[in-house]
Amino acid sequence: MDNNKGYIMAKFNKKKLPSRHTSLGADRAPHRSFYYAMGETEKDVAKPFIGVVSTWNEAAPCNIALMRQAQSVKKGVRSNGGTPREFCTITVTDGIAMGHEGMKSSLISREVIADSAELTVRGHCYDALVGIAGCDKSLPGLMMSMVRLNVPSVFIYGGSILPGRYKGKDVTVVDVFEAVGKHSSGKMSSAELRKLELVACPSAGACGGQFTANTMACVSEAIGLALPYSAGTPAPYEERDKYAKESGKMVMQLLKKRIKPRDIVTRKALENAATIVLQ
């Protein structure tokens, strides 16, 4: 029993899990050799394999804190009897892609994210999945993959950016977008625009506005794939790492109880999510 949260340390029968195909029996000796090459022990290989996927990259601040949070997820998995297998997938960040040909890549990136996460989990026979995402299309992409795979899964949002300060007021990238319009109409000088853009985004995290990322973060809780209250904490806060670790612990409980995304993402759950978005 975990002393803090009451999680039950479960023993798993690997013969009933997908990862048996890559880790059990004499004919899987080569597979096990690969795992030993990565530092895993015989005990680790005998445990359930849990995919930990993030959309970490340096395209925008939305995703740069995700690798840190992934390490906390892995700690939660290991402390509850699993062996985490971390991997990354792509993301196209609308904040950088907007205003030029790059935006043609945005929506299709959602499908690529879903496909790539699904292929990785299926190809390596992972038993469960924790997904961490930080920008517009990556959140629905990972949640889509979870429902398609239908292995025990937990989603966690990477968190929103902190506001900047300009002329004594909180500002976000929304203010910079509006400032571009003011500048084009002659209501703001180039010097003022430069000062604003330098301070508007002071940290890691998704766009500080009610755009797709923060909206889908709310949806992730409403449909039941994310832990309650996990969407609200900004990306730089250490509390995000606590939610990440708890997500790693929770996915092990879902695996033990055989609770899968399609048990959670019901029509009622989707109606609940729609209500949240429309409010």
Model features per residue range: what roles?
Residues 2-7:
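Intrinsic-disorder-associated, low-complexity terminal segments enriched in Asp/Asn/His/Tyr and depleted
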Residues 9-44, 71, 79:
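N-terminal amphipathic/basic leader segments beginning at the initiator methionine
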Residues 9-13, 86, 111-112, 246:
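Short low-complexity stretches enriched in small and charged residues
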Residues 11-19, 50-57, 90-104, 197-202, ...:
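Gly-rich Lys/Arg/Thr-decorated short loops/hinges at beta-loop-alpha junctions or inter-strand turns
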Residues 18, 22, 40, 57-65, ...:
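A short N-terminal beta->alpha junction/helix N-cap motif
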Residues 42-157:
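Long, structured ligand/cofactor-binding scaffold of large enzymes
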Residues 106-279:
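Active-site cavity-forming subdomains of large catalytic enzyme subunits
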